[in-house]
């Protein structure tokens, strides 16, 4: 009898790209009615990176992808599919995936965007996992990048202190020694509360017009207190389900790699799962909220700074507009 091998998808390598320009809290003090103490106390953010002219989501993502492909030991010609998670695409169309493909010089493979706001990396990871495990593709390039500085109102102290720009990427393929196996994924969304976090204008519902520009409809809108409550509750629920479906106890998680939105949210999740502070990886103070790219940027930095031991489990959690949320459990494969 022929027994078909069950394919398991894993992250082979990661990469990240951060713009050079730093926007510090002291810089913001000169722009809006705020202070370093106010920002740090409420968010944990000290500075964030801002893309230069000519640095778009597609470019930042592609630069991160070059690092991930090299670390995976692949050539660009071996990439078979490109997924690009972003909420700040270069254009409505063509896709940022296609633009990144052209920048990278990857020829005529499928390339498409995935939009789930700050949860975009986890959504993209779920799609990449399915494509690899189904046998459709062997090597999938997942990019997550955002340039939210293009949509920030630097006269609104409640939102301008939060966001930064950046790009990230990972290569997903069949599980191999030394890789991070994508053990389980749990995702969710609730469009009935979509208005709590949005960028109202610029789409087909509110096309750009003098009125939408004058009314500030092209800037990020957020009801912070309500978003906070949803974020903690939804990420906790997704994480519990994901951990249980992986056949694990909550105490089995070795590292927490959360979406870098707000230190209070991160600390609340860590507390609920009793994860020691030393095992909660944060980049928030340096980069702020880099939206879809934040989890993968943090994961890439974690892998550069720490040795993940064989058999250790990582929990990724994220929350964003939609409202959308998700959790992913990764396991370090031996070797």
From Swiss-Prot:
Active site: 118, 259, 289
Signal peptide from the UniProt entry: none
UniProt entry keywords in alphabetical sequence: Acyltransferase, Cytoplasm, Fatty acid biosynthesis, Fatty acid metabolism, Lipid biosynthesis, Lipid metabolism, Multifunctional enzyme, Transferase
Coiled-coil annotated spans: none
Molecular function (Gene Ontology), one example: 3-oxoacyl-[acyl-carrier-protein] synthase activity
Pfam families recorded: ACP_syn_III, ACP_syn_III_C
Source domain of life: Bacteria
Reaction it catalyzes: malonyl-[ACP] + acetyl-CoA + H(+) = 3-oxobutanoyl-[ACP] + CO2 + CoA
Pathway where it operates: Lipid metabolism; fatty acid biosynthesis
Example of a GO cellular component annotation carried by this entry: cytoplasm
InterPro entries the record matches: ACP_syn_III_C, ACP_syn_III_N, FabH, Thiolase-like
EC number of this enzyme: 2.3.1.180
Subcellular localization(s) per the UniProt record: Cytoplasm
Location of region: ACP-binding: 260-264
CDD domains tied to this protein: KAS_III
The keyword Lipid biosynthesis is annotated on this UniProt entry: yes
An example Gene Ontology biological process: secondary metabolite biosynthetic process
Subunit relationships: Homodimer.
Family: Belongs to the thiolase-like superfamily. FabH family.
Functional note: Catalyzes the condensation reaction of fatty acid synthesis by the addition to an acyl acceptor of two carbons from malonyl-ACP. Catalyzes the first condensation reaction which initiates fatty acid synthesis and may therefore play a role in governing the total rate of fatty acid production. Possesses both acetoacetyl-ACP synthase and acetyl transacylase activities. Its substrate specificity determines the biosynthesis of branched-chain and/or straight-chain of fatty acids.
Name of protein: Beta-ketoacyl-[acyl-carrier-protein] synthase III
